[in-house]
A protein has these predicted regions:
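Non-heme di-metal
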Residues: 1-165
Length: 165
């Protein structure tokens, strides 16, 4: 896949990067705003929350570069759709592979996925969907979702916990 994608126009690859960053920032927001990392091992929880803050902090970098070099709306949307396809495919295949490596059979994998869906906050899932759909607005910019203060608070919380440990 890398070899094929490397032949695509740079403008499309940059648009895919900006689209993927919108996904990771949206998922980062989802982690920071909800309880997605609750129940994780404490060290893993801190890592996941830290990574979510990192995604939120740089969410507009590729988008700003894309705008600065004049990439238009059609390429931006095509890049987002291709990034969506890649992310969903890799996530599905990767999660199944990791669960199988852990020795889970198909029934256990279905149970694990059902448990994740059960734990989802429906309003937070809808808000996440709205945030992803916003990318299709012509006037969209990632900074329209101002969640950097929330990220800074969560990072400060982790820092306090680490110092107390």
């Amino acid at each position: 896949l890398d070899r094929q994608v490397s032949r695509w126009p740079r403008s499309l690859r940059l648009a895919m990067t900006a689209g993927a960053e919108h996904y990771t920032a949206t998922l980062g927001h989802f982690v920071l705003a909800g309880e997605a990392a609750n129940g994780f091992h404490p060290t893993m929880q801190k890592l996941v929350v830290w990574h979510a803050t990192e995604e939120v902090e740089h969410k507009s970098v590729a988008f700003d570069v894309m705008q600065a070099v004049g990439i238009g709306y059609p390429t931006r949307i095509l890049g987002f759709l291709l990034a969506s396809l890649v992310l969903v495919s890799f996530t599905a295949v990767g999660s199944r592979m990791l669960m199988r490596q852990d020795g889970l059979d198909r029934s256990q994998i279905r149970t694990a996925r059902a448990e994740l869906r059960r734990r989802d906050d429906p309003e937070l899932v809808r808000a996440t969907g709205r945030q992803l759909k916003a990318y299709f607005r012509r006037d969209f910019h990632p900074d329209q979702f101002d969640d950097r203060e929330m990220a800074a608070r969560r990072l400060a919380q982790i820092d306090l916990e680490m110092r107390a440990a």
